[in-house]
């Protein structure tokens, strides 16, 4: 991984990852595929990233799936969790994360800046169905082993705090959000795609 480059696909742990950013000897990487499907939270209540079950899972059980050598290369960072700029729902406090989801702002930074096209004033503001842009294809992801695309979570809030933002199956940014818990946990309808991201120390 010495010759790591922006946009490259790299193997780390049990997954292939896309390199989104390089800063000094660190690389921001995100899984190429949707590696699993989970709810954002385990209860239908107002929540932000700091307290959601998906964050706890990524920084405990998922983090612990890496071996000791790999864990040493995963560098914790302080993440800014901004309010939803279209609906003013709260993003919550900054968090220290080893593993995390991208925010709306990071999705725009690394997969093409679509913020100007998200401006669709109106009661329903259904950008992802009404407006398409050239960056959609960059954000499309598929579950591992599947041929079709599916939607995946962002950590940012949706229009209210019982919803979290997401990337639609066609690559559009869902600024209104999906319910953090879609149905009951037992019925299998509460899940969304998970593409973990992390800052990785580049081997010398």
Predicted regions located by residue number:
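Collagenous Gly-X-Y triple-helix signature in extracellular proteins
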Residues: 1-204
């Amino acid at each position: 991984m010495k010759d790591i480059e922006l946009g490259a696909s790299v193997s780390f742990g049990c997954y292939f990852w896309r390199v989104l950013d390089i800063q000094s000897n660190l690389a921001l990487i995100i899984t190429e595929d949707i590696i699993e499907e989970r709810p954002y939270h385990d209860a239908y209540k107002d929540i932000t990233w700091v307290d959601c079950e998906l964050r706890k899972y990524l920084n405990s059980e998922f983090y612990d799936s890496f071996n000791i050598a790999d864990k040493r290369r995963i560098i914790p960072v302080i993440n800014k969790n901004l309010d939803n700029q279209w609906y003013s729902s709260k993003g919550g406090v900054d968090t220290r994360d080893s593993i995390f989801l991208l925010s709306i702002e990071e999705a725009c930074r690394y997969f093409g800046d679509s913020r100007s096209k998200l401006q669709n004033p109106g009661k329903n503001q259904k950008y992802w169905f009404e407006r398409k842009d050239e960056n959609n294809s960059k954000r499309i992801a598929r579950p591992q082993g599947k041929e079709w695309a599916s939607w995946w979570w962002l950590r940012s809030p949706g229009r209210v705090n019982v919803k979290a933002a997401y990337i639609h199956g066609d690559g559009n940014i869902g600024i209104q959000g999906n319910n953090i818990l879609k149905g009951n946990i037992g019925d299998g309808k509460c899940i969304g795609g998970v593409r973990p991201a992390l800052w990785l120390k580049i081997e010398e």
